[in-house]
Each structure stands twice: as C-alpha cells, then as structure tokens.
Amino acid sequence: MLKRLLGDSVSLVFGNLETVFKVCGSWFILQFALMMLIRLATGGADSQSADPGAMVLLSLVMLMFALASSASIGVAWHRFGLLGETPGLIHLRVGGVELKFILKSLLLALIFVCVWLLVGFVQVAIGVPVVTGVFAVLLLIFAIPTFLRLSLILPATAVEKPISLGEAYAISEGLGWRMFFASLILSLPFVLAGILFQYLLQGMAGSLPIILLQFKLMLLNVLLQIIVTVLGISVLTAGYRMAMEAHSSPDPSVFQ
C-alpha cells in the first residue's frame, strides 16, 4: 500500500510537470511578486521595528492569500488526479468549490489546534514536563494517522462528492501512517536540497550583490515549494483514490 502511494504520487507529479506548473505557476508567481514587494517596502526591517498596524494588515493579507492559493491549487490538482481535468495556462480560480475546500481545511486546522490545546491543558493541570511530553507523544501516535485519514474530506470536496469526517475515517483504514510516511519520504529530499542550496548560495554571498542573493534564494524556495506542495497533495489524492476503489468504480484518472 505504501509502495503504491509512493508510485502513484511520483507518477502523477513527475509524469505531468506541465500540468504542475499550470496548476501552481500563476499562484506562485503572485507569491514571489508579493514577497519581493514586501522586501522592497520594508527594506528588510524586522518585525520588532516595523509598524504594528502595518504588520497586522500584512499578516491578514498573507493569510487570505495563503488560504485562496492553497484551496485553488488543491482543488485543481485533486480534480486533475481524480477526474483528468486539466486547468488552463493561467489558473487563479477561486469559486464555490474552493470556498468549501477552505472551510474543510479550517475545520481540520481547528481539530489540529484542539489536539495541542489538550496537551497544554495537561501541562497546566499536571505541571510535570516529562509527563506532558509522554502524553504528547502518545497523543501524536494516535493523532497523526487520524488527522491524515480525516484529511480525505479534502479531495472528496474537490471532486464535489463530499463526505463527512466519520466517512473519511471509515473508508481509510490502514492508510493513515502510510500516507504520513509517503509524504515524509517524498518531501524530505527536496527539503534537504533546499537547505543545501541555501547554504551554498550564502557561501557565495561575498561575491554576489545582496539583492541578487535574496532573489535567487526566493526563486529557489518557490520552485521547491511547488514540488513539495503537489507531492503532498498527490499523497492525499492517491489515498482517496485507493480508499474509494473498494466502494465505487474509480473515476478516469491520470495515474498511469
């Protein structure tokens, strides 16, 4: 099952790189432009020296952008993987399906926050760090696979066949940890490569203008984010496809 998750996710992404950049390209170009504008506007000032009101407004703008872009990319990629639906060259769609996707994402985020609030409550109630640490580890052992199984509501929402949290959990038995390890295995090489490239570029800082160095670092981060993002989404796409195969005839797909 893990092997299939890995194989399906890799083939979906690296067998369709043109579609990857159609789905993500416009949003990441906007993100890159926004990052450059922020750097130019703030002049590299840190958050402590910046105007608090401006920082709050900036944070809200970034949050709204992140929600819109992640939903648009997630919906488009799930629909491509499960329905074979290919977006246009410029993909910036945020419609009804994307808004539902955002609401489901916020629901999952709320569940995640509640888990950490429970850990905080135990720390306050008991006040023994070792006990809290053990409790947190035990809770995570249960929470990680459960959270990923519940996350199958996202691809279901994207293809407009919504399911409840209970249904997502019921159809995904055995997939939780496998989706976690698949995501880890697929993303780790790119994360490490990003760290290595940043280290190498910083080592060249003396021979490059600072603005050029920042430009290269941001461009590198954007490219790596695209690959890591679609790989993570693809694991959920593949997991949903596998979970649904036993319950209905699979939709036409590009997992070939």
Functional labels for PLM-detected ranges:
Residues 47-56, 65, 69-88, 149-161, ...:
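Juxtamembrane transition segments at transmembrane-helix termini in multipass membrane proteins
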Residues 61-80, 105-121:
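Specific transmembrane helices
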Residues 114-141, 148-152, 159:
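Membrane-proximal helix-loop-helix units in multi-pass membrane proteins
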Residues 19-23, 55-59, 63, 100-101, ...:
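Residue-level signature of transmembrane alpha-helical entry/exit and packing/kink sites
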Residues 109-127, 187-204:
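Alpha-helical transmembrane segments and their membrane-interface junctions
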Residues 26-61:
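Membrane-anchoring/interfacial helices and their immediately flanking loops
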